[in-house]
Amino acid sequence: MTIALGKFTKDENDLFDIMDDWLRRDRFVFVGWSGLLLFPCAYFALGGWFTGTTFVTSWYTHGLASSYLEGCNFLTAAVSTPANSLAHSLLLLWGPEAQGDFTRWCQLGGLWTFVALHGAFALIGFMLRQFELARSVQLRPYNAIAFSAPIAVFVSVFLIYPLGQSGWFFAPSFGVAAIFRFILFFQGFHNWTLNPFHMMGVAGVLGAALLCAIHGATVENTLFEDGDGANTFRAFNPTQAEETYSMVTANRFWSQIFGVAFSNKRWLHFFMLFVPVTGLWMSALGVVGLALNLRAYDFVSQEIRAAEDPEFETFYTKNILLNEGIRAWMAAQDQPHENLIFPEEVLPRGNAL
């Protein structure tokens, strides 16, 4: 058959090859196959956010003003979550809630699901972009692996947490002050700061900041004095092949300071990768736990003793009371759909009240 029909040859003008050639061409801004996901999703997510913060009110979902048009500023404007009555609806523009009416869709909070879902896929597209470029230039994929950590945090906080609760309503709205409100909510209703996964996240982020500061200062401190420029930026050519700092000197310095030091650059830089990425992954796992209403550390024996003995108090029992105050103050305003009414005598009083 092969002799009769001839050898099969692939059409060189195959549509896939043409597309592949155009997408992966060397240009100022690389597109790639990942760009087919990244660029449209990022465009729609950012566009939805700018549209919402500029024009769209949160009156119908939260009883709040949330746009520049209503007098908010950059810190107080937000794209707010849908009302709790809409549960986990995707709130599609053409769905049964909005029925193709754009104004109604915005009033119902449709922009939040639009921004959240397109934002999640944009972040995934950016990670795939790093994979694709690394493969093209024959690098290992650690950049993409590292970027999976902020993606995990975004997905756990904005998508998985509200999926575990009664609706998108309990996710953070997209705004600065809105995120602060969400943090207070997390503390008051979940005691988040006493959650071991939050502790690991804080250790990872602050530890990474410390490592970056130490690493940058050490490299600057151990630069070879063989440049004739006035400062670091003038002394060396940015394209030179040879190193401009001494690892041996750095190792000796920190060995004297701490008694231990990194012996090679691979281990040093892997550690700088490992600390923040692991911290963010752990905090994302913790938020998944909160979605299921898992509790933080509970020191019940201290609570019982504090209830029995008015003179006994610890920072833990103090924080428990503060959390109760947050819940009492926030619940009525933050969950208007519940019609919660707290009598004046049960609300906590601060010195200013």
Swiss-Prot record:
> Carries keyword Phosphoprotein?
yes
Domain of life, per the record? Eukaryota
**Enzyme Commission (EC) number:** 1.10.3.9
Q: Where in the cell is it found?
A: Plastid, Chloroplast thylakoid membrane
User: Topology relative to the membrane, per the entry?
Assistant: Multi-pass membrane protein
The top EC class, named as a word, is: oxidoreductase
Please tell me where Fe cation binds in this chain.
H215, H269
Concerning NCBIfam families, the annotation shows: psbD
Function of the molecule: Photosystem II (PSII) is a light-driven water:plastoquinone oxidoreductase that uses light energy to abstract electrons from H(2)O, generating O(2) and a proton gradient subsequently used for ATP formation. It consists of a core antenna complex that captures photons, and an electron transfer chain that converts photonic excitation into a charge separation. The D1/D2 (PsbA/PsbD) reaction center heterodimer binds P680, the primary electron donor of PSII as well as several subsequent electron acceptors. D2 is needed for assembly of a stable PSII complex.
**Under which name does UniProt file this protein?**
Photosystem II D2 protein
This protein's species is Morus indica (Mulberry)
Gene that this polypeptide is encoded by: psbD
